[in-house]
Amino acid sequence: MNTVLKKETLSRAERLGEVRPAYLEALTLVERLHRRLLDVIKDEFDRRGRSDINAVQALLLYNIGDKELTAGELRTRGYYLGSNVSYNVKKLVEMQYLHHARSRVDRRAVRISLTQRGREVHDVVTSLYEKHVLTVEQIGGISGDDFSRLNVALARLERFWTDQIRFRL
């Protein structure tokens, strides 16, 4: 019985030894990829001579798209990746990239949607992503199957983290 317990402990320690470096590398890559995506978006706007908007704001406008949302919905739906939703929404309204109006249902809530100017930014990001879709397999060496497997793993990781918060695991 003692031998079985030692094998069980050893195998758990071995699994931990295998998972730890892979998990920590994945965390580093996710964080680095997010920063790199913002760099790619910034570079696209720089190439077009646009310095009126930053990459976080452009990504926010892209994620809003044709929807009409509240700032709270931006956070809860995961569309917003930064820490200060209110600040960027306020700036985008001031710069006329976003419409804002009181909700007809809940007068406390402000609904936001893209202006024509915001749609133009959305279209720049859409065009960038379309260019990537056409070249990522040939130049980046990443196939549709690779993305499918990656998306399954990332969705599982997101669910794991969500459960950590929700159920205080």
What are these model-derived regions, one by one?
Residues 1-51:
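N-terminal leader segment of winged-helix/HTH proteins
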Residues 1-19, 142-169:
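C-terminal regulatory/oligomerization modules of transcriptional regulators
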Residues 6-12, 90-149:
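Charged, amphipathic alpha-helical coiled-coil/dimerization segments
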Residues 22, 33, 56-57, 117, ...:
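N-terminal positioning helix adjacent to the helix-turn-helix/winged-helix DNA-binding module
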Residues 31-34, 61, 65, 115, ...:
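Generic structural concept
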Residues 33, 37-40, 44, 78, ...:
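Alpha-helical linker/hinge and terminal dimerization helices associated
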Residues 39-83:
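N-terminal helix-turn-helix DNA-binding core of bacterial DNA-binding proteins
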